[in-house]
Amino acid sequence: MGAEGGGRRRALRLGAYVGCGAVLLTGCASMPDSGDLRGVESTPRQDAQVRVFAMPPREDAAPAEIVQGFLEALTSDDPQYETAREYLTGDASKQWRPYKSTTVLADGPNPEPERTRNRETGDDFAYTLTGSRLAKVDGQHAYAPDSGDYTGTVHLTLQRKTGQWRIDALPQGVVMGKSDFERNYKSVNKYYFASNVPAGTSGQLGTVADPVYVRGKVDPVTAMVTELLKGPTRWLAPVARSSFPTDTGLKKGVTSLAPDDQNKLTVPLNKKADRVGRAQCTKMAAQLLFTLKDLTPTGVDEVELQRSDGSTLCDLGEAEAESIASHGTGKSGEYEYFIDGEQRLVRLSGSSNGKDPDPVPGALGEGAKKLRAAAVSRDEVTAAGVSFDGSSLYVGSLVSGASLGEAVVHSAGTTEKDRLTTPSWDGGGDLWVADRDPAKSRLLLLQKGSGEPLEVRTPRLDGRIDAVRVAADGVRIALIVERDGKTSLQIGRIERETKADERADVSILELHSVTPQLEEVTAMSWAGDSRLVVVGREKGGVQQMRYVQVDGSTPSGSAPASLTGVQQIAASEDERLPLVAYSEDGIVRLSSGAQWQKVMKEGTAPVYPG
């Protein structure tokens, strides 16, 4: 439950000056001067470095003051909600589980008094909390969009011994408004290894990002280490694995972790990890380094894991971690690719300015087959191209003189829009494409880009696939799905089983929309380990471009600069590389901190490797 309403608060400010710096502690909770309970509005966004602390209940506070003070205390940076518990009776405090869930409302919860339940004694009150749900963070700290009305009841009783009002019954978890949630919580990726995907073309293990929300100013390092040790969240668990032995946790008595002045983090573990060998230990340390990389201002450069007796299990630096698993910027490609005015596949170096693109080596760059779309493998050795009419898919080598064989997939759709989508390569070298033929719409997979196409099972798909983008990890897939004239962006989990004949049985499970507020999604692309860039439109609105997380949340930071008439978008999972789009101005590029720049007027279908 959370409070908001800056105008009502009597903020307590303490400035502690050290040299030229200052640390500001800002109190968030105060009591209304009267017994009337006003709506709890959203707190304005505050500086990320400001710590917010709650005020305890004042003597002889009225029931309305207790409820509002408790709601505001929930939005503070109190590590264990100790101040919030002062508003509860002893029994209620023991039964309350604030970490069970966090419900996010459009505005702060609005408390409305109910009739006094005991009119004769007047020693109890009840308040109904109402609001509009936006999202929920579960006990595993996983975020999910939500909608509908929120209702919860807070009951108070007059304590006979003290004569003070206290809350004796309340909903489990916490509830707060959107702006308080954004101020209090931070989205961070935990990293695990893909469990059912072959190693990538480099032979390295592949990492999978598992985004969770933790309280950003309440010891986030310890929180993230603890959450990583617990294993993947429920949605990701079937396709991801941890190198930490089951039930591994922090050594008993260890309550806080912090890197030293050399950015080295020491992590004492319990007995479950005592007998781990070095090879496994380095994978464990790599998971920690990937997870903690961007969590602190200076980062974590080295991790030391310790046994329960304090001896060193292993240590690992950042460079060594990158050699263990493909991760982050190691996935980036050398070129941007698109289709030029002659319907050839061409490429342009990401660092080039004002230079004309070059046709790719091989048949797809020679113009023998006119193309409307293409995809380049992540190692930039092979490419797939869709014929200009959308009916055929070809795969060819990006080597000078390489020929092009017969089409590997055909669509019988009667119009271009009812034929093949732009294809997509995963990190294991498999090729994906959707056939939009209304008579036989299907999602297809070509293992290593060749052989007989495998039809992928989509048991809960409600609509037709209009676009496909597979994440580099090979375990998550983004789909634009059309149904009844509306389109949505959905994320699914890729599960693979090998049959007796060694052919894979592949399914897309637990599809869920990550853009419920958009009525139309025009284009999308992966733009990070757990982030996508989306072009779409809200009901009655205009086209816009935004970033969205795979869990449906909005990442911190600004949206891309606006651009008119965007039809296609391409981003790299290396977030340092520019966005590339096809708009009414042709192929355009957006580098960080810059404006959109025209690359080529006669060009379409931009892509990065993948």
UniProtKB/Swiss-Prot annotation:
<dbReference type="Pfam" id="PF10647">
    <property type="entry name" value="Gmad1"/>
</dbReference>
<dbReference type="GO" id="GO:0005886">
    <property type="term" value="C:plasma membrane"/>
</dbReference>
<feature type="lipid moiety-binding region" description="S-diacylglycerol cysteine">
    <location>
        <position position="28"/>
    </location>
</feature>
<keyword id="KW-0564">Palmitate</keyword>
<protein>
    <recommendedName>
        <fullName>Lipoprotein LpqB</fullName>
    </recommendedName>
</protein>
<comment type="similarity">
    <text>Belongs to the LpqB lipoprotein family.</text>
</comment>
<dbReference type="InterPro" id="IPR019606">
    <property type="entry name" value="GerMN"/>
</dbReference>
<keyword id="KW-0472">Membrane</keyword>
<keyword id="KW-1003">Cell membrane</keyword>
<dbReference type="InterPro" id="IPR023959">
    <property type="entry name" value="Lipoprotein_LpqB"/>
</dbReference>
<keyword id="KW-0732">Signal</keyword>
<feature type="lipid moiety-binding region" description="N-palmitoyl cysteine">
    <location>
        <position position="28"/>
    </location>
</feature>
<keyword id="KW-0449">Lipoprotein</keyword>
<dbReference type="InterPro" id="IPR011042">
    <property type="entry name" value="6-blade_b-propeller_TolB-like"/>
</dbReference>
<dbReference type="InterPro" id="IPR018910">
    <property type="entry name" value="Lipoprotein_LpqB_C"/>
</dbReference>
<feature type="signal peptide">
    <location>
        <begin position="1"/>
        <end position="27"/>
    </location>
</feature>
<dbReference type="Pfam" id="PF10646">
    <property type="entry name" value="Germane"/>
</dbReference>
